[in-house]
Amino acid sequence: MSQLRVTQVRSTIGAIEKHKRTVRALGLRRIRDSRVHRDTPQIRGMIAKVRHLVRVEEVED
């Protein structure tokens, strides 16, 4: 299964609370913080909600 590297590129200051919680649920705390997640529909949905705050790259296993 492929994996996704999610990196926070913009601050959550001024973002709506739902987006702040989604970024935290992805494991991101600050700008340039990265986490690797399995490529699942649930993770893709979370990324879609905060796509203006994060950058996504595919990672080969």
Curated annotation (Swiss-Prot):
CDD domains: Ribosomal_L30 (cd01658). Coiled coil: none annotated. GO terms for molecular function: structural constituent of ribosome. The keyword Ribonucleoprotein applies. GO terms for cellular component: cytosolic large ribosomal subunit. Gene3D superfamilies: Ribosomal protein L30, ferredoxin-like fold domain. Keywords: Ribonucleoprotein, Ribosomal protein. One of its GO terms (biological process) is translation. InterPro entries: Ribo_uL30_ferredoxin-like_sf, Ribosomal_uL30_bac-type, Ribosomal_uL30_ferredoxin-like. Belongs to the universal ribosomal protein uL30 family. NCBIfam families: rpmD_bact. PANTHER family: LARGE RIBOSOMAL SUBUNIT PROTEIN UL30M (PTHR15892:SF2), MITOCHONDRIAL RIBOSOMAL PROTEIN L30 (PTHR15892). Part of the 50S ribosomal subunit. This is Large ribosomal subunit protein uL30. It comes from Rubrobacter xylanophilus (strain DSM 9941 / JCM 11954 / NBRC 16129 / PRD-1).
